[in-house]
């Protein structure tokens, strides 16, 4: 029952309700037909309102109520939030039970005027109704006044052709009025918009039955005009007398539809009609579109950097990285200015004896230096393997141990004085910066003396390692020992008998710094002096490119061995550095002309490491010396401190103290790479930290030279053990066979160089080990194969570091003694790095000495500035690999480095798993009302509706039927008459079931 307001905005359908495109008005009891309102203009579509409350069950269909005026447009609902999920379409609700017919409701608020529909098809002609019973002819009524013609409505869009509705309820029979004159056929007006059906007008009084007039000829069927606007309803005429019922004429063709009449006055409510059939279940409406996605918020300003986090925990010791590829040798830098030697520190543990190289060509003897006053006799050092003679340096006298003084200006190298008597072995001082090479003196003319026996190793004390002070002034050259006669220049002397190194002579007073002399030819490397105290470890730097091997220089005449140079100031112990990459072992080079100091020998047994002090400024790193061939490889330990260099070559200018860099990530220890050719010896670099002391084994007898053994794999470094007192060095073992070159491992990742701290005080030197037995002096033979490493001695206890003393002057070098290599002493502490000297020609490599006990790995020091890369020396013999040292304490993490550039964009990673669907968001606020949509296309014409069935006669306020008259004869079919004026609208009869007509808009049908 009721009208179909499907064009109104539809409320959302709840589950279980009859949804669909048809918005059916609730049925209720009407109060009678009302006047029909004019079609209003099309309003913009309204926003969806909130769902209305559940309506009452359907009432019994009542008579259509009068159409009220078009209601005002309701306010737009609040904007919905745009982030709601689109609802899923609800399932069609179950068909509700047809409720009892409710009482006719009051007329509802008139809905919004519908959109103008497309003109519908002409409906099929309704079935001819059964002829009604002839009514009693009433009195002819007074002719009614012609109503004012209604205004012609604007032509509406053609509606779809509606289905032929069922015949409407029969209106109550009105009184027959007098037949008015047939008016002229008016022009077919434009079809107005379909208005709502007007309510029936008030029932007219029954007039007397009039006589039936003759049937007029049926007029031609007029075209169906569009519904025009109804004219006003005229007042009812006076009822005439009931006329006799005339014979029913033949049904004429439908005439042109007149314009709909204006709504009549509201009638009295009729009785409640019977319950109408339940309408068909509506289609479920489609879900509304999802709300538009909210716009992304503006990107916030980048947040300020947070505070620096605490330093991260120390990582595990990385495995040793493999050796890097050999880089090309960089150009030799110019000799730097000679730095003033630092005050002498307490002696560090002896370094490993270097490999004795064949005597180089003897250089011209330099002029004798002024003899300095004799210093205190130092303790005899461990005999080291004889290296190629270097140019004599200018050690100063050993002064009393003082605190580090400021660095003095470089002095001029003094001439070497005569070799003084061997004094007691003094405490090893800090390693000073290498001084510039002096001019080569004329060869001495004395005979070579026998090498003295090695003195006992001194006891080491235990001192706190203080910060290394700046280098002291270079002392005056000490008294030189008696100079032997220099050999003729260039002539190779017959190697003398190998004597044990005698005790070092006293240091002379330090003379004023001299000007750097011109670089003389490289002399033979002198005996390896005891290592100075360990200097600070530098931060692990990036591995430099390995220089290409240089060609061996021509053999120079062997110079006389110089006295041990003054020890430089000890650098403070730095933080524990990363394990460096093992360099390639070089092959033995030929005797070169006298050049800069030869390769540093293998470290001796480790002395006790002093407490970590502040690191001194690191000097530039010198070029790598020749590597020995690897023996059987034990666990690779950190490198022990280097022994004292031979007489220094011309010193390079000390580099500026670098700022401490941020500590980089610890690199993995790489596998030991294959031995590369040895480059030409550069100036001695800073000593590395002492390796951990291994257990001292008994010295085995010298073994026969074996074949080279295969290199063993590097084991992981063990934890640091407690440093024991240094034991006496074991006897030298036999040389082992030369092992094959190991594969070069990948380069480990280095940390960033930290800024050098101030040098710390050096600890006292640990006790010396027992000297190894010296072999009988013999003539130098060809270099033999490497012997197997001897058993390592027990580590010595860590001595306290004393204050550095002033270095004495270097005496003239004595004759080069020839003898078997002595036992390797413990490595001394690492001193401050010296200034790089200009690289000299490579000296001849001697046979490798035995491996000493590894010392404890020292704390990591600050890295110094890198020195110029020296020319590659001739390959030296393969040295034996020392036992692995224990890892030292890990250094404090450096400050965070600056952020590097953004790396290249990596490949896109795989898509992550689909996240869990988030909770449904709160519905957003309803957006502002949109602009009215464009008018849709005209809908397709609907199919012609089926003819409706006859409605049942309802119990309307119909008057009593008159007696049925006799049926008159059917007259001939008359012609179509002209359209008459619209008569008064009769009262609505009972509504027929079904039928109606549809008019479409935008493809949808609306049922009226």
Curated annotation (Swiss-Prot):
Biased composition (Basic and acidic residues): 82-94, 657-666, 917-928
Gene Ontology annotations for the cellular component aspect, listed alphabetically: extracellular region
Biased composition (Low complexity): 38-81, 164-193, 239-260, 301-314, 358-374, 409-428, 513-530, 542-552, 582-629, 636-656, 674-684, 704-714, 768-795, 803-813, 826-842, 862-884, 892-907
In-chain residues carrying the UniProt-annotated modification 5-hydroxylysine: 116
Positions annotated as glycosylated: 116
Key words, A-Z: Extinct organism protein, Extracellular matrix, Glycoprotein, Hydroxylation, Secreted
Domain of life assignment: Eukaryota
Tissue specificity as recorded in UniProt: Expressed in bones.
Extra facts: These protein fragments were extracted from ancient femur bone collected at Rampart Cave in Arizona, USA and around 28580 years old.
Purpose: Type I collagen is a member of group I collagen (fibrillar forming collagen).
Organism the protein comes from: Nothrotheriops shastensis
Subunit structure: Trimers of one alpha 2(I) and two alpha 1(I) chains. Interacts (via C-terminus) with TMEM131 (via PapD-L domain); the interaction is direct and is involved in assembly and TRAPPIII ER-to-Golgi transport complex-dependent secretion of collagen.
Cellular compartments annotated: Secreted; Secreted, Extracellular space; Secreted, Extracellular space, Extracellular matrix
Pfam families, A to Z: Collagen (PF01391)
PANTHER family: COLLAGEN ALPHA-1(XXIII) CHAIN-LIKE ISOFORM X2, SI:CH211-266K2.1
Gly residues bias spans: 336-345, 455-466, 553-562, 694-703, 751-760, 989-998
Entry PTM: Prolines at the third position of the tripeptide repeating unit (G-X-Y) are hydroxylated in some or all of the chains.
Parts forming coiled coils: none
Name this protein carries in UniProt: Collagen alpha-2(I) chain
Primary location class: secreted
Similarity comment: Belongs to the fibrillar collagen family.
UniProt region (Disordered), positions on chain: 1-999
PTM-bearing positions, type 4-hydroxyproline: 9, 12, 45, 51, 380, 383
């Amino acid at each position: 029952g009721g009208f179909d307001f499907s064009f109104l905005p539809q409320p959302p359908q709840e589950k279980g309700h009859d949804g669909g495109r048809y918005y059916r008005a609730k049925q209720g009891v009407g109060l009678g037909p009302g006047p029909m309102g004019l079609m209003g203009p099309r309003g913009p579509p309204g926003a969806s309102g909130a769902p209305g409350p559940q309506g009452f069950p359907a009432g019994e269909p009542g008579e259509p109520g009068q159409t009220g005026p078009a209601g005002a447009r309701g306010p737009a609902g609040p904007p919905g939030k745009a982030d709601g999920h689109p609802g899923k379409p609800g399932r069609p609700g179950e068909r509700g039970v047809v409720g009892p017919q409710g009482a006719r409701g009051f007329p509802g608020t008139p809905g919004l005027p519908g959109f103008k529909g497309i003109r519908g098809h002409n409906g099929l002609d309704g079935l001819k109704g059964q002829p009604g019973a002839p009514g009693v002819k009433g009195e002819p009524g007074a002719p009614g006044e012609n109503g004012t013609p209604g205004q012609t409505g604007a032509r509406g869009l053609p509606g779809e052709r509606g289905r032929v509705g069922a015949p409407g309820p029969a209106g109550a029979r009105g009184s027959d009025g007098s037949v008015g004159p047939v008016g002229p056929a008016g022009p077919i007006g434009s079809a107005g918009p379909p208005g709502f059906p007007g309510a029936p007008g008030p029932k007219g009084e029954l007039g007397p039955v009039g006589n039936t007039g003759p049937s007029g000829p049926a007029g031609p069927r007029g075209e169906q005009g569009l519904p025009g606007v109804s004219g006003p309803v005229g007042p009812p005429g006076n009822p005439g007398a009931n006329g006799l019922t005339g014979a029913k004429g033949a049904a004429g063709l439908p005439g042109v539809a007149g314009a709909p009449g204006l709504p009549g006055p509201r009638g009295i409510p009729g009785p409640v009609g019977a319950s109408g059939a339940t309408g068909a279940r509506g289609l479920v409406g489609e879900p509304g579109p999802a709300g538009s996605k909210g716009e992304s918020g503006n990107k916030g300003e980048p947040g300020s950097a947070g505070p620096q986090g605490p330093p991260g925990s120390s990582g595990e010791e990385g495995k040793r990285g493999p050796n890097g590829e050999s880089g090309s040798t960089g150009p030799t830098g110019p000799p730097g200015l000679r730095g003033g030697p630092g005050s002498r520190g307490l002696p560090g543990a002896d370094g490993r004896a270097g490999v004795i190289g064949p005597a180089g060509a003897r250089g011209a003897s330099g002029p004798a230096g002024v003899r300095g006053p004799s210093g205190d006799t130092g303790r005899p050092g461990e005999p080291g393997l004889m290296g190629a003679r270097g140019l004599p340096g200018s050690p100063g006298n050993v002064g009393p141990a003082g605190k580090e003084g400021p660095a003095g200006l470089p002095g001029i190298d003094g001439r070497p004085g005569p070799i003084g008597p061997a004094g007691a072995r003094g405490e090893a001082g800090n390693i000073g910066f290498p001084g510039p090479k002096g001019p080569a003196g004329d060869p001495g003319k004395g005979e070579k003396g026998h090498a003295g026996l090695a003195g006992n190793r001194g006891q080491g004390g235990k001192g706190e390692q203080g910060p290394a002070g700046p280098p002291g002034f270079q002392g005056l050259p000490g008294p030189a020992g008696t100079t032997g006669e220099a050999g003729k220049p260039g002539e190779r002397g017959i190697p003398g008998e190998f004597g044990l190194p005698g005790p070092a002579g006293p240091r002379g007073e330090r003379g004023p710094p001299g000007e750097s002399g011109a670089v003389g030819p490289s002399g033979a490397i002198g005996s390896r002096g005891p290592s100075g105290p360990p200097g600070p470890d530098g931060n692990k730097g990036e591995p430099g490119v390995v220089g290409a091997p240089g060609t061996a220089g021509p053999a120079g005449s062997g110079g006389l061995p110089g006295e041990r140079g003054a020890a430089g100031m000890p650098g403070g112990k730095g933080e524990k550095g990363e394990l460096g990459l093992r360099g390639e072992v070089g092959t033995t080079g030929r005797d070169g002309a006298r050049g800069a100091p030869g390769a540093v020998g293998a470290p001796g047994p480790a002395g006790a490491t002093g407490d970590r002090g502040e690191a001194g400024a690191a000097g530039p790193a010198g070029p790598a010396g020749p590597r020995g061939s690897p023996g059987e490889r034990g666990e690779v330990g950190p490198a022990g401190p280097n022994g004292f260099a031979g007489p220094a070559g011309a010193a390079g200018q000390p580099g500026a103290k670098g700022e401490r860099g941020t500590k980089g990530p610890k690199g993995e220890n790489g596998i030991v790479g294959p031995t590369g050719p040895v480059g030409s010896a550069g100036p001695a670099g800073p000593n590395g930290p002492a390796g951990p002391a291994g257990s001292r084994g008994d010295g085995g007898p010298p073994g026969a030279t074996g074949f080279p053994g295969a290199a063993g794999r590097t084991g992981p470094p063990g934890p640091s053990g407690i440093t024991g007192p240094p034991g006496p060095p074991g006897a030298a073992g036999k040389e082992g066979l030369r092992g094959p070159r190991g594969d070069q491992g990948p380069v480990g990742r280095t940390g960033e160089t930290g800024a050098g701290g101030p040098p710390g005080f050096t600890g006292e030197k640990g006790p010396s080990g027992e000297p190894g037995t010296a072999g009988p002096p013999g003539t130098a033979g060809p270099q033999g194969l490497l012997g197997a490493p001897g058993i390592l001695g027990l580590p010595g206890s860590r001595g306290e570091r004393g204050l550095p003393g002033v270095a004495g002057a270097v005496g003239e070098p004595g004759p080069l003694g020839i003898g078997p290599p002595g036992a390797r002493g413990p490595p001394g502490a690492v001193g401050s790095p010296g200034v790089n000297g200009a690289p000299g020609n490579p000296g001849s490599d001697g046979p490798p000495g035995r491996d000493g006990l590894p010392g404890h790995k020292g704390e990591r020091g600050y890295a110094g500035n890198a020195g110029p890369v020296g020319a590659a020396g001739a390959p030296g013999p393969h040295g034996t690999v020392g036992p692995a040292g224990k890892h030292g304490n890990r250094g404090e993490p450096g400050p965070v480095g600056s952020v590097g550039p953004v790396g290249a964009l990596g490949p896109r990673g795989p898509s992550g798993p689909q996240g869990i669907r988030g909770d449904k968001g709160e519905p957003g606020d309803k957006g502002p009302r949109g602009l009215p949509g464009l008018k849709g296309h005209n809908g397709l014409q609907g199919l012609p509706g089926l003819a409706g069935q006859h409605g049942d006669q309802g119990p309307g306020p119909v008057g009593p039927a008159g007696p049925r008259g006799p049926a008159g004869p059917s007259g001939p079919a008359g012609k179509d008459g002209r359209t008459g004026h619209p008569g008064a609208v009769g009262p609505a009869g009972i509504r027929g079931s079904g039928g109606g007509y549809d008019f479409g808009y935008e493809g949808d049908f609306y049922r009226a």
